[in-house]
């Protein structure tokens, strides 16, 4: 076998050198990629740890908030029960006072005529008694002689009470 020509040897050497350079370059890139992956893995692990801590804190905060809300709910329910009892008591009081309110409304409806009657009685008191006169001659506009079917008691009462109205207002 004959020796390969020098050109082939140089080409083969150049090719081997290029392969070695390429291998070294790839190894350098692989090392860089491994460092990058390792750094990313560390960052991800740290980030995962931070997220787990935040998630744990959120869980504790949620539990605290649930406890607070349960306490508020119990307080609100107690308040509702208290208010319902108060409403029931007031409803009972209203039921008891309703007849009295109706009576007062009836009194208020009757007040104006009663006030008119009291004014008329006061006017009668102001006028005073009739002057004494002869029973045979009644004053004009006054009561007339006793009727035929009268018992005469009315005349006796008029004789005993000379005032028109014997009341004071």
From Swiss-Prot:
GO cellular component terms attached to this protein's record: cytoplasm; type III intermediate filament
Compositionally biased tracts (Low complexity): 126-135
Keyword Coiled coil: yes
Bias type Pro residues, positions: 136-146
Subcellular compartments: Cytoplasm
Keywords from the named record: Coiled coil, Cytoplasm
Keyword Coiled coil tagged: yes
Coiled coil region boundaries: 7-89
Disordered: region residues: 126-169
Protein name in the entry: Vimentin-type intermediate filament-associated coiled-coil protein
Name of the encoding gene: VMAC
């Amino acid at each position: 076998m004959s020796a390969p020509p020098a050109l082939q040897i140089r080409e083969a050497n150049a090719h081997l050198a290029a392969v070695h350079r390429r291998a070294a370059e790839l190894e350098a890139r692989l090392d860089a990629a491994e460092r990058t992956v390792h750094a990313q893995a560390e960052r991800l692990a740290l980030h995962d740890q931070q997220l787990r801590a935040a998630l744990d804190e959120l869980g504790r905060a949620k539990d605290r908030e649930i406890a607070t809300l349960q306490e508020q709910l119990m307080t609100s329910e107690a308040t509702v029960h208290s208010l319902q009892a108060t409403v029931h008591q007031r409803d009972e009081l209203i039921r008891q006072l309703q007849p009295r309110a109706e009576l007062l409304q009836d009194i208020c409806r009757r007040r104006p005529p009663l006030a008119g009657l009291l004014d008329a009685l006061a006017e009668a008191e102001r006028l005073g008694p009739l002057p004494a006169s002869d029973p045979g001659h009644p004053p004009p506009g006054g009561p007339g002689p006793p009727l035929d079917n009268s018992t005469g008691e009315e005349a006796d009462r008029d004789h005993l009470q000379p005032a028109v109205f014997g009341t004071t207002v």
